[in-house]
Amino acid sequence: MASLGAFAKRLFGSSNDRRIKAYKARVEAINALEPDMIALSDDALRGKTAEFRARLADGAVLDELLPEAFAVVREAAKRSLGQRHYDVQLIGGMVLNDGNIAEMKTGEGKTLVSTLAAYLNALTGKGVHVVTVNDYLAKRDADWMGQIFRFLGLEVGVVLHGLDDNQRRAAYAADITYGTNNEYGFDYLRDNMKYQLASMVQRGHGFAIVDEVDSILIDEARTPLIISGPLDDKSDLYLSIDEVIPEIGEEDYELDEKQRTVNLTEEGNERVEEILRNRGIMLEGNLYDIENISIVHHVNNALRAHKLFQKDKDYIVKTGKVVIIDEFTGRMMEGRRYSDGLHQALEAKERVPIQPENQTLASITFQNYFRMYEKLSGMTGTALTEASEFGDIYGLDVLEIPTNKPIARIDEDDEVYRTTREKYEAMIGEIEECASRGQPVLVGTTSIEKSETLSELLKKKKVKHKVLNARYHEQEAHIVAQAGVPGNVTIATNMAGRGTDIQLGGNLDMRLADETAGIENEAELARKTAEVKADIEAKKQRALEAGGLYVIGTERHESRRIDNQLRGRSGRQGDPGRSKFYLSLEDDLMRIFGTDRMDGMLQKLGLQEGEAIVHPWINKALEKAQQKVEARNFDIRKNLLKFDNVMNDQRRAIFEQRIELMRAEDVSDTVDDMRRQVIDDMVAAHVPEKAYAEQWDMAGLKEEVKKNLDLDLPIETWADEEGIAEEEIRERLYSASDRHMASKAAQVGPDLMRQVEKAVLLQTLDQHWREHLMMLDHLRQAVGLRGYAQRDPLNEYKSEAFELFESLLARLRENVTRQLSVAQFITEAPRIEEQPLPEMQAHHTNPLTGEDEMADGDVATMQRPMRNDPGVAADPNDPRTWGKTPRNAPCPCGSGKKYKHCHGAL
């Protein structure tokens, strides 16, 4: 069957081929317009923007404008940047405009491709969001590609960390806005915590182009963006529990590296209970009694911190802080924190100051944020391996765009060694040989620890090299830019999201920026530019003669996509190149995913010390292992999305209601309806339908009415009246409360009353929504255990989350009614104050436990840096610079004492 399928594909072409062929017909139409565009003056070319907008206003659709609009952008790029869109780039632009994903190999000019679809869609006036993975790329692309848009009369904005509301609002008001996924998501959440429409910064979600779309929509799909605020300090408890873990043995817990879980055994539970009692942490009962449930939570986090999380792989300790390492990019994620107490457990383990836990105030996943856009598209070098996920979850098709020139890179079969030592020896020998003949080498590692191990080995061999990983990311763009220089050896943790091309001979733009900075004399500038260009061209020829860039992988990642990204760094724009992975049976993927058969086979082959096995069968076996992991991760993400959709429906309902309330000049009808519903609920609870009068709880009703409506009525005598029923009681309460509120309105005036009602309604809604989020978090963790009772956790979650939502609405009605009824008004109009925004955090959800584990503190906050912000130095002699110091942390003055026994003494 497979051979028949392959034959049919050769005969008729694949689905991808057929769709690309259809686009090629439109490319010819665009090319036919090029002479006309060349003939236009700059002003006439710029005038096309107004012409297109007028045609749209007259009823034209974007597809009708596409050929001419793309031709205009191509000509503008030639005049402003000196770059002309290739035909394949025009195809990429059409794929984006159709709301799909364009897979384009490294070096094919994805950044330039985005300008085509961005310009066309910006003509509608709804705004276009171009999404990048970091601030550096957002600013670079806004400055660089912005030249095209500004040439054509469009405004370009960029949303960066640290901007205030006014700057953000201006950026979003532009025709095209550049920014990171975090910034867009946080701005959406913050907008939904505002109290006035004029304070909001975003203006809708029309069209988004997501660069590195696989990184953002797949790798970070389980990373909710969460706005949170600090809770109470529990440093002592974290430290006390941390001291328990070293006292338990391997027999006391079960560790599953594949599933990334660790649990106490029955013997381990007994051992921990004994230690906790001896230390006075747990006074009575057993570990799983309800009064000890918080201790279980702390023990589990401490166990995970010690047994699952490795220093220099999962995190590093830097300037007294535990900093998370992104497993996909190898970058430090400064400010990000694991949630639910895990980060505090790591801080206790490493004996650094323990920061307080945080409470969720608002959250959204990238999956649900980006699905809000009317049209979504993306670009990446590697998406086909995840095509089914893009289709199932986002409704996006992935199209592979042909390369401008055929790929000349040779991807060699993996070399598999018995031990890590043998693998490194072979790798070092290969690197030495390449460096000696001038071939540039890029070595990809999966962790900081491994990159530094390799660096030490190269130092011993006196091989010059540079290291690119999370510790030195400030210099990464310049290091990558020079990775194609002949003889250069560059070691890098996973290359995802680097965003800078590796050009053979070196990066011309970066060298010119560095070496011509400050030169004002035009003749000197021209001379220096020519000198740099000649030097780079000579070095490029040497690198080409040596075989082009050689990419070496030190082990396979569990995602084929990450491996493909590393390979794709070589062979850009038809350049020659090579790639090879060096593996050992001690590698994580090989060790965890069943290499017993492979080990047995290597032994039977009688491999000698330092020998490797190279065979296509090895590559296929590893690919199958990777496919299994990818399929499992996809299932996990789909399952998590089902749970998050429940919260997303509720979030959308609350946020939409908030917007309606802010838009409304008068919310009195809403408040009146709430008050009447509260009265209905009170009467139903105390005067049951079809019950006799002597069964009515009139004393209870009187008490409730006094508490919620601030009315002292002779309710207890009503039951004695002849023929009275619950309907009449309800009507009497309606009338009495209406008169009560009317008198308040008369006292302060209708305008002030309307302001008070809106302020109370919005602030009470926010408070209850925060509490509701916390309850949903607890519910999400609790329902996971119900599978053991043969009950579907998702159905349980849906049912109970709905009940919680109904409870939220009931409490909201009751509290709004009570606050307005009992309030004593002054005659001065109250101001609806914008609340100071808490620190921003992006939590990472453990795909196996469903717990949110990562918090992104200080990401995209509008506030000035806190005094204890990583970017603000603390002066030991100036307590004003210390910020909020936990009482059990070392005192910042340097005395060596705890803060509570030094400057923090009460």
Swiss-Prot record:
GO terms for biological process: intracellular protein transmembrane transport; protein import; protein targeting; protein transport by the Sec complex. Zn(2+) binds at C891, C893, C902, H903. HAMAP family: SecA. It catalyses: ATP + H2O + cellular proteinSide 1 = ADP + phosphate + cellular proteinSide 2. GO terms for cellular component: cell envelope Sec protein transport complex; cytosol; plasma membrane. It is a peripheral membrane protein. InterPro entries: Helicase_ATP-bd, Helicase_C-like, P-loop_NTPase, SEC_C_motif, SecA, SecA_CS, SecA_DEAD, SecA_motor_DEAD. It comes from the Bacteria. It is found in: Cell inner membrane; Cytoplasm. May bind 1 zinc ion per subunit. The keyword Calcium does not apply. Keywords: ATP-binding, Cell inner membrane, Cell membrane, Cytoplasm, Membrane, Metal-binding, Nucleotide-binding, Protein transport, Translocase, Translocation, Transport, Zinc. One of its GO terms (molecular function) is protein-exporting ATPase activity. This is Protein translocase subunit SecA. Monomer and homodimer. Part of the essential Sec protein translocation apparatus which comprises SecA, SecYEG and auxiliary proteins SecDF-YajC and YidC. NCBIfam families: PRK12904.1 (NF009538), secA (TIGR00963). Its cofactor is Zn(2+). Its EC number is 7.4.2.8. Part of the Sec protein translocase complex. Interacts with the SecYEG preprotein conducting channel. Has a central role in coupling the hydrolysis of ATP to the transfer of proteins into and across the cell membrane, serving both as a receptor for the preprotein-SecB complex and as an ATP-driven molecular motor driving the stepwise translocation of polypeptide chains across the membrane. The keyword Repeat does not apply. ATP binds at Q89, G107, E108, G109, K110, T111, D501. SMART domains: SecA_DEAD, SecA_PP_bind. Belongs to the SecA family.
